Regions:
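Glycine-centered helix-boundary capping/hinge motifs
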Residues: 162-163, 193-195, 255
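Active-site and donor-binding regions of nucleotide-sugar-utilizing enzymes
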Residues: 8-190, 204-212, 240-242, 261-262
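Charged active-site motifs of nucleotide-sugar-dependent glycosyltransferases
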Residues: 7-9, 195-202, 234
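Donor-nucleotide binding loops and adjacent catalytic segments primarily
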Residues: 36, 45, 197-198, 210-265
Length: 265
């Protein structure tokens, strides 16, 4: 295992924007808590990149949702899986941490385990084995050494289902509780010129390009219907930069011009 005289090498694999946010927080926490330097490699997005990760490829290559979107990009996704496995095996990190997105990250973990069984593999964010397909928990033991859970009941669920050892590490929203409670909506309302005494519709198309492509049409139909009935005059859409253009184009003909907000706005 890694000695303290050389950097700890952690290979991280995220599969979408939420995983990128979790990975970035994990990187910051490890850098703050460990008494040795840390080197990161693997797959991530802008937030992980800002903390020193040079991703093997853009996260948008694999951040897709829905069977049709997956089928259209399947050759690229498969090639990215194998490229990630090849990189991990070649680099021989001290640990691999897969982050959520089990359809993508678990495919990578299984192949790393087959090719290089000595590399420890940690799964950050438990699949919802307690809700459906519980047999996954026991199968995970073949390629996951430890699970870091966001929900407090998940360690016991894994124990009962025969899954890997599991530790509750907390949910990111809990870490931001004080910030959430301190939020003052007035500055944003004033900046967007919102009428506080009127209903505000928040539209949530997600961060994946495939989600935006699939959802904006029914969202637009809903907004038109609500507007025609006099129920909606103000719309807010949280966006991430790489899908902002798609959302702007999709909402250009809406009867209500939505306010697009990014980050912690």
């Amino acid at each position: 295992m890694n000695g303290s005289d050389k950097p700890l090498h952690i290979f991280l694999v995220a599969g979408e924007q939420s995983g990128d946010a979790l990975g970035a927080s994990l990187m910051s926490a490890l850098q703050a808590k460990l008494d040795q330097s840390v080197v990161f490699s693997g797959v991530g997005g802008a937030q992980m990149g800002a903390r020193g990760l040079k991703s093997l490829f853009p996260l948008s290559d694999v951040a897709v949702m829905g069977p049709l979107s997956i089928l259209r990009r399947l050759p690229r996704i498969i090639s990215r899986v194998y490229a990630t496995v090849d990189a991990a095996v070649a680099e021989r990190p001290d640990v691999v941490v897969i982050i959520d997105s089990p359809e993508f990250t678990h495919a990578i973990a299984k192949r790393i385990r087959r090719r290089c069984p000595a590399i420890p593999i940690v799964d950050y964010v438990s699949p919802t084995v307690w809700a459906w397909r519980p047999g996954r928990a026991k199968r995970m033991r073949r390629y996951v050494d430890h699970v870091l859970a966001l929900l407090p009941f998940e360690p016991e669920a894994h124990r009962k289902l025969g899954g890997p050892p599991c530790t509750y590490v907390g949910h990111p929203l809990i870490e931001r509780r004080e910030w959430l409670e301190s939020l003052n909506p007035t500055p944003l309302a004033e900046r967007l010129e919102l009428e506080r005494d009127q209903p505000i519709l928040v539209v949530l198309p997600g961060s994946r390009s495939s989600e935006v492509e699939r959802l904006m049409q029914p969202f637009g139909d809903t907004v038109r219907l609500l507007h025609a009935r006099g129920l909606v005059r103000q719309v807010i859409i949280p966006v991430v930069p790489h899908v902002r253009g798609m959302i702007e184009q999709a909402t250009a003909a809406w009867p209500v011009r939505p306010h697009l907000v990014e980050g912690d706005e």
